[in-house]
Amino acid sequence: FLINIPSKYTNNTSYNTARRHLNVLVNYLHEHGFDIQKSTLKTRKQNETLHKPINDVKGLLDEVYCFNKNLHLCCLLTYCCLLRPHQEIRRLKWSDFSEDLKTISLSGSKVKSKRNRVVPVPLYVRELLIKGEPHHNIFTHATRPLNKDYFKTVWSRFKRVSKLLEQDQTL
């Protein structure tokens, strides 16, 4: 019975997630005396896709700037500060920046690794920042951040109209 449950997944990542959850449950029941065989579900290899390098990063960033200034700032923070766009950048507040805007301090509750991070901000990124109220989001200029799919949606729209971005390229 348990072997058939994950077979509905064609995506290897989804299969491995379901397999991991099932293994925990089945192995717990087995260890606590239930008449059930230990799980023998094996992991599936996840497919890796290699993105093509971007030859003209400055040209692409200029094109992004003309398309959407929020997306441009997000791309700069992703590319130059190595922040993650969908959580770390989208939820940035001015209080996360130092007074001189030279560093961004992120607490462990705001980052995937759960570790505190202090990230330097290059001069060309600082020149685009206009400091606002400490409790305000850097994109919305209000207390609420953009919705969680905002940058994904804007990036998808940009990819459709971009003249420089090729298939399998991303920042």
Model regions: which residues?
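Phosphate-coordinating loops and pocket residues in cytosolic domains that bind phosphorylated ligands
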Residues: 3, 62, 90-91, 99
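Conserved beta-strand positions that form and line the central face of beta-propeller blades
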Residues: 4, 59, 105, 137-138, ...
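Amphipathic, well-packed alpha-helical segments that form the structural scaffold of globular domains
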Residues: 3, 23, 27, 58-65, ...
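Basic, Lys/Arg- and aromatic-enriched nucleic-acid-binding interface segment
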Residues: 12-16, 31, 36, 40-86, ...
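Active-site/catalytic core of tyrosine-dependent DNA strand-transfer enzymes
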Residues: 122-169
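Residue-level detector of conserved, well-ordered beta-strand and adjacent loop positions
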Residues: 55, 61, 107, 122, ...
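Conserved tyrosine-mediated DNA breakage-rejoining catalytic core shared by Y-recombinases
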Residues: 91-129
